[in-house]
């Protein structure tokens, strides 16, 4: 058996009992009897068989019985009878005669020395606390409410986490030592009592902390709490000194209440100036979640600022080209900072011309007409020279995207190697425009909402996979046929309606991809928050997220909803989209806009208990998120329905065209 089986309470009891036994034996038992007991070969074998815990229980009972016999007091007899096991042991010890009882004390005294338990002095005990060798006061319920929560922690805190933990350890050690009987202070000893050493350490830690608190711009409440802390500490030192001087004359509640006042004052100060975490444990605890720094930077204002910048760029785009360009964000991540926002190009006509040039080069590979060679000089005068310097100085928003750029050696233009790649998904829809279309202004042949990123930038979805397989089957009808628009092999002219149908079809498919990808992000996030709200009402409340964490997670949904609302609204204003999306889609967008505003207001004031009760907050948050989930799914179905109608119309047009031929 080793001493680590004993708790700290038991170790302190053994040390105290050993000192009591030694002092009493030296005062009352003759030296010959003590020497005879030490030289005795036949020791008490029953004591050697006991474990450390059992031996501690016996030592405690013997010490209590010894105190009763020395004071001739039986006042504690009724208390010991409450525990059956301890009551039986006390009753047996009380029936022992003085000779046998003294012999038992000598045996216990010898057994303590044989087990080397008397070497566990308080200095070794304190060193073990710092090294974590002893589990100090693990079952203490007094400090359960003293655990650090999110309200006490802050990155701009003044009190370091190390000082907080050291003070907590000293507070616990002080309470621990007040639970045992304290003898009057012996002036002949060279070492201070452990209780006095503890209160001196507490005073030193608080004294080192006061200059740090004084460096802060003092508020009236903080000044009052500092005065309260100094007064409580002075009272605790005085109470400890009197408690050690007069022993049992002063109840232990006096010392405990005095140190409690110090703890209360320290907690009030910690709530005002906050505790700063510097350990690795607190940093890795929130890894993978939303940073508290970002949450402290008022994310709603950041989102509003980004929206204003985006709207300003859209207005400048309208002033240059006279049309509105629909630009889908290429990332499925929530837009929480400026660098994540997609850049809106001020002159969309340049990108449209580059796409026209790319489609012309693609058509040159399949066109067999000798007179149908394209002259890019007819397109170059249409470039906006006003914004050409801006294009060379500002990086393209697609330069950072993981796209494969295919160099075209046939292109006589120096921009041929830097043109953005049109993905395979859009190449299926890119057609070879006839001569009449090339000579027309670009604004008439290309829709202003054609500036949509390639499908490689958008998350893949099951619907997109089905559409691609469908297009591959349709393309088998003819080697040079496309869905809704046939690539001409002769001098025939195609109507502009066919070109518009193709462009419209490509954009409606990209809209489906965009809405589906965003729904895959919004729905799991909303469901996770709803699960935490439900857990907060059940027995799993401790495992649920706090109100502040729910607010932060809900704020992440807002920019994603706004991007879906913004892109879908811009698509609905186009003439070709009005018939497909209909009034039902418009109603869904209005409901989602209302949900986004309510969620923003709730998450701004939801963490403040004075604004809204916790129960009411959970109810409102659940209602909003359920509405968001419902409307998001309806929007996905609405866009899918519009896409199916478009595919059906294109397919019927394709077969009608084939039958005419």
UniProtKB/Swiss-Prot annotation:
Keywords: Actin-binding, Cell shape, Conjugation, Cytoplasm, Cytoskeleton. GO terms for molecular function: actin binding; MAP-kinase scaffold activity. GO terms for biological process: bipolar cellular bud site selection; invasive filamentous growth; pseudohyphal growth; regulation of cell shape. Residues 356-365 have a biased composition (Basic and acidic residues). InterPro entries: GIT_SHD (IPR013724), Spa2/Sph1 (IPR039892). Residues 313-340, 356-418 are annotated as: Disordered. Signal peptide: none annotated. The keyword Cytoplasm applies. Its main location: other. It comes from the Eukaryota. Pfam families: GIT_SHD. It is found in: Bud tip; Bud neck; Cytoplasm, Cytoskeleton. Residues 318-330, 366-395, 406-418 have a biased composition (Polar residues). GO terms for cellular component: actomyosin contractile ring; cell cortex of growing cell tip; cellular bud neck; cellular bud tip; incipient cellular bud site; mating projection; mating projection tip. Present with 672 molecules/cell in log phase SD medium. Polarity-determining protein which forms a conjugate with the ubiquitin-like modifier HUB1. Involved in bud site selection and cellular morphogenesis during conjugation. Required for pseudohyphal growth. Conjugated with HUB1. HUB1 has not the classical C-terminal Gly residue, so it is still unknown how conjugation may occur. This is Protein SPH1. It comes from Saccharomyces cerevisiae (strain ATCC 204508 / S288c). The lineage of its organism: Eukaryota, Fungi, Dikarya, Ascomycota, Saccharomycotina. The gene is SPH1.
């Amino acid at each position: 058996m080793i001493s680590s089986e004993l708790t700290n309470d038991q170790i302190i009891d053994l040390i105290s009992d050993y000192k009591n036994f030694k002092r009493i034996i030296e005062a009352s038992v003759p030296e010959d009897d003590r020497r005879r007991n030490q030289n005795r070969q036949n020791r008490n074998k029953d004591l050697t068989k006991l474990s450390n815990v059992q031996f501690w229980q016996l030592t405690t009972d013997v010490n209590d019985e010894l105190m009763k016999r020395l004071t001739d007091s039986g006042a504690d007899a009724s208390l010991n009878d409450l525990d059956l096991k301890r009551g039986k042991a006390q009753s047996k010890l009380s029936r022992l005669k003085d000779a046998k009882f003294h012999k038992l004390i000598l045996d216990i005294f010898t057994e303590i020395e044989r087990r080397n338990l008397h070497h566990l002095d308080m200095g070794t005990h304190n060193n073990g606390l710092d090294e974590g060798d002893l589990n100090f006061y693990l079952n203490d319920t007094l400090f359960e409410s003293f655990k650090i929560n999110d309200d006490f922690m802050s990155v701009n805190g003044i009190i370091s986490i190390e000082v907080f933990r050291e003070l907590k350890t000293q507070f616990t050690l002080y309470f621990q030592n007040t639970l045992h009987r304290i003898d009057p202070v012996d002036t002949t000893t060279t070492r201070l009592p452990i209780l006095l050493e503890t209160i001196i350490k507490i005073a030193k830690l608080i004294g080192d902390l006061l200059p740090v608190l004084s460096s802060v711009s003092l508020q009236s409440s903080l000044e009052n709490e500092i005065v309260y802390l100094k007064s409580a500490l002075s009272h605790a030192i005085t109470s400890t000194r009197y408690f050690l001087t007069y022993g049992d004359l002063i109840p232990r509640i006096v010392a405990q209440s005095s140190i409690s006042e110090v703890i209360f004052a320290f907690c009030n100060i910690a709530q005002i100036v906050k505790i700063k975490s510097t350990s690795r444990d607190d940093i890795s605890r929130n890894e993978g979640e939303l940073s508290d720094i970002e949450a402290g930077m008022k994310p709603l204002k950041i989102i509003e600022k980004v929206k204003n910048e985006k709207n300003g760029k859209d207005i400048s785009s309208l002033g240059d080209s006279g049309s509105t360009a629909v630009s889908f964000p290429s990332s499925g991540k929530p837009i929480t900072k400026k660098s994540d926002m997609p850049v809106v190009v001020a002159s969309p006509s340049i990108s449209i011309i580059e796409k026209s040039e790319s489609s012309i080069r693609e058509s040159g590979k399949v066109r067999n007409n000798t007179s149908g060679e394209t002259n890019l000089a007819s397109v170059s005068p249409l470039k906006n020279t006003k914004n050409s310097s801006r294009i060379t100085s500002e990086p393209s928003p697609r330069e950072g995207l993981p796209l494969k750029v295919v160099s075209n050696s046939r292109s006589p233009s120096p921009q041929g190697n830097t043109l953005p790649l049109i993905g395979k998904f859009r190449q299926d829809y890119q057609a070879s425009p006839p001569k009449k279309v090339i000579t027309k202004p670009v604004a008439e042949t290309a829709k202003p909402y054609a500036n949509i990123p390639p499908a490689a930038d958008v998350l893949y979805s099951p619907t997109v996979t089905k559409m691609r397989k469908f297009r591959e089957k349709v393309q088998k009808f003819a080697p040079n046929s496309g869905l809704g628009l046939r690539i001409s092999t002769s001098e025939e002219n195609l109507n502009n309606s066919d070109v518009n149908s193709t462009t419209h079809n490509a954009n409606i498919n990209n809209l489906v991809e965009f809405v589906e990808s965003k729904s895959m992000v919004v729905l799991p996030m909303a469901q996770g928050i709803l699960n935490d709200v439900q857990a907060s009402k059940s027995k799993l409340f401790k495992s649920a997220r706090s109100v502040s964490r729910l607010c932060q997670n809900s704020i992440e949904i807002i920019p994603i909803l706004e991007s879906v609302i913004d892109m879908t609204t811009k698509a609905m204003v186009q003439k070709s989209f009005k018939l497909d999306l209909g009034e039902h889609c418009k109603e869904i967008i209005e409901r989602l806009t209302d949900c986004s505003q309510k969620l923003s207001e709730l998450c701004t004031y939801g963490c403040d208990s004075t604004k809204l009760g916790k129960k009411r907050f959970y109810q409102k948050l659940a209602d909003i998120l359920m509405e968001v989930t419902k409307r998001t799914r309806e929007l996905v179905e609405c866009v899918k329905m519009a896409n199916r109608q478009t595919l059906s119309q294109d397919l019927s047009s394709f077969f009608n065209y084939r039958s005419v031929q």
